[in-house]
């Protein structure tokens, strides 16, 4: 019998497992899509933000960093330990998270190569829908360059108004932890 996954929020960088989580984070996401550790020090106190370590028994499985907004959770970062990839840990973690929280929005790279196409199919198998709205948020780190992303939502599509509200949320709640002094509004085409 497999042990259930647990989502245990980190409250500080001193918490058990943060070093493993940070190493996975740095290996899984490009520099411009990552915050600094100092930004996490500030974000840990934000009631809208949760940086979960994913655990099975005492074993560190991965990370799921997410935000609470009005009517949905925004999954900002999800990664599974490389040693456990291919064992459906990402599927199990995201499925459990979606069942628990309901409505979820996330962003992915446009499906333009094998990896990004597989990533989109992964989310679609879990019930996510690609929306016709692209977001262009600036990177978290200098130099600030917009990065075109596809909005995906669970369990169904979002409206243009919801996409606009999401863009406002990213600008007002999320980008304040980036290196931006006055983040520009992510634009929807």
Where are the regions a protein language model picked out?
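Conserved beta-strand in the GNAT
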Residues: 53, 58-68, 72-79
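Short strand-loop junctions, especially beta-strand C-caps/beta-turns
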Residues: 78, 83, 107-111
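Conserved acetyl-CoA-binding loop-helix of GNAT-fold acetyltransferases
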Residues: 80, 86-99
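Short amphipathic alpha-helix that is part of the acyltransferase structural core
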Residues: 1-39, 149-151, 162-188
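Conserved catalytic-core motifs of GNAT/GCN5-like acyltransferases
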Residues: 31, 107, 120, 124-144
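A short helix-loop-beta-strand connector motif used in the catalytic cores of GNAT acetyltransferases and
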Residues: 43-53, 145
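A contiguous, mid-protein "functional segment" used to position or interact
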Residues: 130-169
């Amino acid at each position: 019998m497999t042990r259930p996954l647990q989502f245990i929020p980190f409250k500080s960088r001193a918490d058990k497992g943060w070093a493993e989580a940070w190493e996975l984070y740095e290996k899984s996401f490009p520099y411009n899509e990552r915050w600094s550790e100092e930004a996490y020090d500030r974000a840990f106190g934000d009631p809208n933000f949760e940086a979960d370590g994913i655990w099975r028994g005492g074993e560190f499985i991965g990370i799921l960093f997410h935000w609470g907004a009005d009517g949905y959770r925004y999954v900002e970062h999800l990664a599974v330990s490389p040693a456990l990839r291919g064992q459906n840990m990402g599927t199990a973690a995201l499925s459990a998270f979606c069942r628990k929280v309901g409505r979820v929005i996330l962003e992915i790279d446009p499906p333009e190569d094998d990896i990004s196409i597989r990533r989109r199919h992964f989310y679609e198998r879990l019930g996510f829908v690609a929306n016709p709205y692209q977001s262009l948020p600036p990177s978290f780190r200098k130099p600030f360059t917009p990065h075109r992303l596809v909005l995906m939502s669970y369990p169904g599509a979002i409206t243009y108004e919801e996409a606009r509200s999401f863009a406002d949320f990213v600008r007002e709640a999320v980008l304040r932890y980036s290196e931006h002094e006055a983040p520009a509004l992510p634009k929807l085409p």
